[in-house]
Amino acid sequence: AYEALVGAYVISLFVALKNVGLWVATAAWMAGLVAVAEVLAPSFSTTDALKLMAVGYVGQELAHIVTGEKTFQSTYQFKTPSWPMLLLEHTYFLLPLCIDALVHMKESFASWIVAHNYVVRCKLTNKEDKRALQTVVDFVTKEDPARDCTAHWWYQRLNGDVKEAFTHVMECPEMMGMFWKRFRSDCYNVEAIPAMNEIYVASSHHNNNSDTVFYTQHCDGPWSVYPFCHVYRVMLAVNENKQVETHFTMERSGGCLSDGDAVGFDYNREIHVISDLPTKNVDRRITCKLHYVVYPKCFGWAGKVKGTLATWYNTTARNLFLATIKPRGLVWKFMAWNVIFTTKRVRELEMYAGLNNVVFAAALYVAGQFIHPRFFMCATSFTHYCMYIATYHVREGINFGVFKRNVVFFKTIALTHLCVNYLMHFEYDPVSLAMILVGYGLSTAATVALGMDQTYFGVELGVMKPNFVSGFPYNCVPHPMIVGSMIGLLGFHKMASFRAALPYLVPMHCAMYMTHMIQEQVRDIYKKDWGKGGKGKARGGARKTKAA
């Protein structure tokens, strides 16, 4: 009987919606629900069904409470005598409305797994901002700190004009505006963290003390795993600087910050370093370090907690840092060495794996111990394809270094699954071995010819110009990276014992690969350029570059 009711509902929507595409999507969704109900209904009693409905309703309401989001129903319920009629209309159109909202999202779901570029920039130029910066310069000049090591004045210990000046630049429209250019104001909160702020004066040299950290690639904080929330450090150049450059390793950008230039970066995740140019500054380099916590509005207090954690760590690290600027005795010299050693190891972890990725993979592995023996393999074998597809779809505002790190990390896990299972079920099959060696050999040769950056969307993401390759293997095989990878994958599948144990693994790899290849073909962002000189070389070289 319920099938007839569903059919009547879908037919009535065809007239009511007056939108064929939306109606087709709604009908397909209802058909899917009916199919699932046919499978699950026999295993549920009436009591179980009522419990499930109650859990769903309570969970929905709890989600609204946690996120602080009002429901549409709450805006009219009990407000007028006719509100039940509006409730019926609301319920009738609820599913197509949800689908329509999904289609018209301001930001695609694909952006959730994209390696976004979170570095933000601005420049303070108006009279009020310049006056505030000059107040800071005058303060430092009057204090006249030693030039052979860094000097620090914490915001909370400042007084008078200099504190007012610091507060001004911390809250000025230009400073806050650079965050709103990156984060939607209707979705995020941006709040200052005064307890972390300071006036910083650079030293003229560094000599195996904790100052050396600044000249070593590093991340500032340890809370990179805390999801969806950011603590920003903003480096604001107070005076002229033509000597010291600030570089962001993964974003591949950098330069001298001078006279009101400001750059903000994720305190816990962004690898950065400073270096000296041959030119010398006339005066000491003065910088204001400002900090902000940025979190989704729906996180509420949970977002603020990241700011609290960062403040605690910054205070602890600050005390250690000050004690090791001029280390005395073996203990403090060892502590200074330990600061540098730990900084380098954390940098290596973030650059080549990413603590987020490591923790995520570890969590999936642990979950797999309770869910299914194959869960970890299924959850991590196709992640890199999803990242390819999502990144190619979004393309704007991508941190190329982080993207490349992430896909290589998960691709390595995927290949490890293939190799481990191949060895576990190994039986001698010369054709299988030959296909793997030839296929991945061809794919590797194509990667070497293109280079790693071009292989991983370097051209599509605008970080490099295309290198039109006409030599081996592009002069022998069309699309050698795709062809080679597919041959290698099918080589795994060729071995009977591997195929019997994991009949769907390689077909799923091939399906994901083909999905992305079709995406590139359909959304060919360079198709207007093929007749302008690249022609066949470009098709064989710069495009279709992903290795499985």
Regions flagged by a language model, labelled:
Residues A1-T71, M85-A110, R318, T324-Y474, ...:
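Membrane-anchoring alpha-helices and their flanking helix-loop junctions
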Residues A28, H206, Y226-A262:
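Glycine- and acidic-residue-rich phosphate-binding/metal-coordinating active-site segment common to enzymes
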Residues A110-E191, G397-N399:
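Non-heme Fe(II)/2-oxoglutarate
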Residues R121, T216, R233-A237, A262-G264, ...:
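Conserved hydrophobic/aromatic beta-strand scaffold that supports enzyme active sites
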Residues Q156-N241:
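Conserved double-stranded beta-helix
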Residues Q243-F341:
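Catalytic core of Fe(II)/2-oxoglutarate
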